[in-house]
Amino acid sequence: EPEKEIIREKPEGTNYDFRDPKAIKIGEKYYIVLGACVDEKGTFLLYESEDAENWKYRCPLITEETRIRTIECPDFFPLDDKYVAMGAWMSHYDEYGRFQQCRYYVGDWNGDAMDVHTQQWVDFGSNCYAAQSFQHEDRRILIGWISDFYGEHIATEPGAYGSMTLPRELHVKNEHVYTKPVEEVYTLLGDTVYEGTGREIKVGSIADNRYYASVSFEETGDFNILLGQDGDKSISLTAEGGKVFFKMAGVKSDKVQFVSSVEKCRNAEIFVDGRTIEVYLNDGEDVG
């Protein structure tokens, strides 16, 4: 059948950035959130329908006051007695030099504009963009696009551009989004190469640069974990001066600060898969 245009209406002041519809059914109604720029502000636009065929514009769900080009790839869903919106901030650098991240918003919603209580980055690392979630049985699962905004990917023939994060299960606790790998990820683990305790641990090289590590700290002080190294290029997970962050060396993003919202790290789960590293802090309090 021919494609059917279902949304033409958009609020006055909306420019050509008008994209990426995400549909969801809440109660007996259907809703679509669209990413847009309205009056030079990144905006989540909310549409509603009784039958998923005939749509009308409702209102701005969220208007972001920070100067960004537009909201891309918005998402919106109920979770743990709260509502969560997510959107990718296009052409934005934060105070640490990170480029184009995803933002989440947690709050209440009664059908009009969302009453936002808290907001934070979806991921404190690099290149997690256009994150989208879906409902699988009783789980809300998120997958992000690992892009290459810093131009660090070394392509090989036949080559590919970008990859995806691990599937992440979401929950809201204390009005913040907690993120953990879905339980199925752990079925991929192989043999244990080291298990023990100590302040200085050297494991050595690991075949194919693929490994999982679970680390717990008796004290929430400073530490440094070398996650990977290739000559003068390296990446570490570091706690120093009340901040937890990725420390980069010898790569194009080594001047960028990838700082977590976590101030005191009690534990970390580390997944390394070739060119990708994912770290989950404090049982899902933050991820990068």
Which stretches of residues belong to each language-model region?
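Conserved Ser/Thr-centered positions that define the repeating blades of beta-propeller domains
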Residues: 1, 48-52, 107
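Loop/turn-rich, solvent-exposed surfaces of beta-rich toroidal or solenoidal domains
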Residues: 75, 79-92, 100-106
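Beta-rich accessory regions
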Residues: 108-288
